[in-house]
Amino acid sequence: MPLFYNTNPFIFFKVYKYKIFNNLAEEGINVLAEAKYIQDDSGPDALILRSFPLSSEDITKNTKCISRAGAGTNNIPIDEATKKGIVVFNTPGANANAVKELVLCGMLLASRGIIQGNAYAESLQNKSSDELNKLIENQKKYFKGNELNGKTIGIIGLGSIGSLLAQATNVLGMKIIGFDPYLSVEGAWMLPKEVQKADSLEYLLSNSDYITLHLPLTKDTENFISKKNIEAFKIGAKLINLSRGRIVNNEDILTALDNGKISTYVTDFPTPDLIKRSVQNRGVILLPHIGASTKEAEINCAVMACEQARNYLENGFITNSVNFPNIRLGRTSKFRLVIIHRDEPGMIVKITSEIANENLNISDMINKSRNENAITLIDLATEPSQKLIKCIEKMRKVVSIRLC
């Protein structure tokens, strides 16, 4: 979904500071290239990062938003940010195609003896041409695999990545079972009509040749795949996990590999035990967390993260926040109040009453809430006084207020 900058004459010049953690694609930094943006580590308005483990010390009193160039936000102290009225963004979908393509690659690696075949071919480096031909023809039977066409893939999580994967595997002639109890209407529209939506996780697990996970890491999804549901897998199923390592219980997976319940485990999250198993060439294929590591994905994530931070700082717009609701209001004046507060009855009346007491006219306003948190955008016909801003700021349940 494209994001738009407000370039109308209502915008007045204000300088914002931002701090970047990790390396960020230049295309993203260019979004903040105007004179009103300064890269400054002292009291930045916006923190922009990829996988950097953000701590409480990185958050200052001036921090207004944190923008993650990527989907996962388990490296950000979200609860603390929310209490302080700091909006946390991520970039769902920006790296979806990159992950989708690597899942397809993982499925092929798990099916065709590609890695083993390559290792064998390299072991023949000192053989003559005649010897090579004989050896290859004699040994290739050991690398015989299976095709994807006609097999069943179970996709757990039908968001941006899951829906793209469903489209791709449908073209490959696979049967598709999807499971996502939180599937949105928008997500449903992206799915091919051939996708069979499972009523239960057990149904998907027991009917899928390939199972691929596309879930965020939360308290509810940690050890999502473990002994208790591995029992439901088809014998010899292949599991692909490019989401988060802790979604899968590795100890239980190794046991399932030993007893043949699972034939192959492909994951982007190596551990010492998994590496040991992979070196032994016993059903584990490891990748060094490269699911989103493409030039295109890094650019998409960086641009999206910086655009979201910019739109929030300049206009109070929120898109793809993990802790506050989406909100957008077209500008009707150059004086906009952005108020973060708890979602309680009477808050709007209290705020607007104070504005009325100052004889200020409200041009337009909007209020949105998510769980116990809310944000209100108010456009004023004339500039509010610092006295009014301080008065609203001191209200019970108001977390922060700013003029943008």
Question: For each of these PLM feature ranges, what is it?
Answer:
Residues 236-331, 375, 404:
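Rossmann-like dinucleotide-binding domain for NAD(H)/NADP(H)
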Residues 162-163:
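N-terminal Rossmann-fold NAD(P) dinucleotide-binding loop
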Residues 55-57, 181-277, 293:
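Rossmann-like adenosine-cofactor binding region
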Residues 100-119, 167-174, 303-317, 352-356:
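Oxidoreductase and adenylate-handling cofactor-binding alpha/beta cores
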Residues 319, 323-404:
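A conserved regulatory-domain signal marking ACT and ACT-like small-molecule sensing domains
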Residues 5-91, 206, 226-232, 249, ...:
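An N-terminal-biased, well-structured beta-alpha scaffold segment characteristic
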Residues 84, 92-152, 320-322:
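Phosphate-binding beta-alpha-beta segment of Rossmann-like dinucleotide-binding domains, i.e.
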Residues 158-159:
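Glycine-rich Rossmann-fold phosphate-binding loop(s) that bind the pyrophosphate
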